[in-house]
């Protein structure tokens, strides 16, 4: 039975199968249509937790056998792929969280399945992404670093045209946030695919995160949203996985539909972010940033609850600290 047949028949894959899957995707001698069919088939397969951890560890260990570490560093990002066309929520959140003194290493990419990826909006903001050898100094000076996935993992460039041709989320949407080149202490990760939450949570535990939260937003978004019950998986190195749901109203924020969070081009999304960070926007767009920043501040042990995290995020914006962080970055 070929690898493609095994995948199409939803078989569990061995370590050898996983190696073959990766080698095939990155082999320049194999035709693109073969890779597209293989990646499509794997994306439709019920992926085992072992398979996810194998893929993540393969990319990290192949590229960073001595993975760098920065004390108490956090990443806040989503998988993308939720087709919501929301503005760049997690990028905006990164400025708020960093303004609280949490070292943030945000690992992002250009748009694959949306109008504006994190590096697209950063380019509009005139904020450069950092090379790997610049990150530690950047964190020491500014407390916030942005890394482009195609810089930290150049091999990923080979897959960009294939992923764009598929035009729907693939396994690499799930892998991207998990392969931050730095060994993180804390992580908040939004996930568009609810069925993978438990697998990803266990993989984060395998990667040694001290604390992390996974979010499947109400109505399918890869961020915590204001439109109903957000599914939360809380990861801790000290206890078992904890699953619960969270509504915006429980932390003092108003209900709002997901379509009120729609963004647009990188230029539009830059302006939305600036309006929020400067304190001039008091719409649901601000509230969704407060919610996600509140979750991140809770994970980073800055506050004792998500509700307190939301209050802290309000303070950081309303006192100008979040905007000061943005200006510090050269935006």
From Swiss-Prot:
Cofactor note: Binds 2 magnesium ions per monomer.
Keywords per UniProt: Amino-acid biosynthesis, Aromatic amino acid biosynthesis, Glycosyltransferase, Magnesium, Metal-binding, Transferase, Tryptophan biosynthesis
EC number: 2.4.2.18
GO molecular function terms attached to this record: anthranilate phosphoribosyltransferase activity; magnesium ion binding
Gene Ontology biological process: L-tryptophan biosynthetic process
Top-tier EC class: transferase
Residues holding anthranilate 1: 78, 109
Annotated residues for binding of 5-phospho-alpha-D-ribose 1-diphosphate: 78, 81-82, 86, 88-91, 106-114, 118
Pathway: Amino-acid biosynthesis; L-tryptophan biosynthesis; L-tryptophan from chorismate: step 2/5
Residue positions binding Mg(2+) 2: 222-223
A GO term from the CC aspect: cytosol
Binding site for anthranilate 2: 163
Residues reported to bind Mg(2+) 1: 90, 223
Cofactor(s), names only, from the UniProt record: Mg(2+)
Catalysed reactions listed for this entry: N-(5-phospho-beta-D-ribosyl)anthranilate + diphosphate = 5-phospho-alpha-D-ribose 1-diphosphate + anthranilate
Summary of the function given for this chain in its UniProt record: Catalyzes the transfer of the phosphoribosyl group of 5-phosphorylribose-1-pyrophosphate (PRPP) to anthranilate to yield N-(5'-phosphoribosyl)-anthranilate (PRA).
Record's subunit section: Homodimer.
HAMAP family xrefs: TrpD (MF_00211)
UniProt similarity note: Belongs to the anthranilate phosphoribosyltransferase family.
Protein name per its UniProtKB record: Anthranilate phosphoribosyltransferase
Taxonomy of the source species: Bacteria, Bacillati, Bacillota, Bacilli, Bacillales
């Amino acid at each position: 039975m070929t690898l493609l047949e095994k995948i199409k028949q939803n078989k569990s894959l061995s370590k050898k199968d996983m190696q073959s899957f990766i080698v095939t995707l990155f082999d320049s001698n194999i035709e693109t249509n073969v890779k597209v069919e293989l990646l499509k088939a794997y994306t439709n397969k019920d992926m085992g937790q072992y398979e996810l951890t194998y893929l993540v560890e393969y990319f990290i260990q192949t590229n960073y056998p001595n993975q760098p570490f920065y004390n108490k560093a956090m990443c806040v990002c989503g998988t993308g792929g939720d087709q919501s066309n929301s503005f760049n929520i997690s990028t905006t959140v990164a400025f708020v969280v960093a303004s609280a003194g949490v070292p943030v290493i945000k690992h992002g990419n250009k748009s694959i399945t949306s109008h504006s990826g994190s590096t697209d909006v950063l380019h509009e903001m005139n904020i450069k992404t950092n090379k790997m050898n610049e990150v530690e100094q950047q964190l020491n000076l500014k407390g916030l670093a942005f890394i482009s996935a195609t810089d930290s993992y150049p091999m990923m460039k080979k897959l960009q045209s294939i992923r764009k041709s598929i035009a729907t989320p693939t396994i690499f949407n799930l892998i991207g946030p998990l392969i931050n080149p730095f060994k993180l202490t804390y992580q908040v990760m939004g996930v568009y695919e609810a069925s993978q939450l438990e697998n990803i949570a266990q993989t984060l535990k395998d990667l040694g995160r001290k604390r992390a939260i996974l979010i499947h937003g109400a109505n399918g978004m890869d961020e915590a949203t204001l439109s109903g019950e957000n599914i939360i998986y809380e990861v801790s190195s000290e206890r078992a996985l904890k699953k619960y749901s969270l509504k915006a109203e429980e932390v003092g924020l108003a209900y709002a539909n997901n379509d009120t969070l729609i963004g647009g081009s990188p230029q539009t999304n830059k302006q939305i972010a600036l309006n929020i960070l400067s304190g001039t926007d008091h719409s649901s767009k601000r509230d969704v940033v407060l919610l996600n920043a509140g979750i991140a501040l809770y994970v980073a042990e800055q506050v004792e609850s998500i509700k307190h995290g939301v209050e802290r995020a309000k303070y950081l914006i309303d006192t100008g600290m979040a905007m000061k962080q943005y200006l510090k970055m050269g935006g």
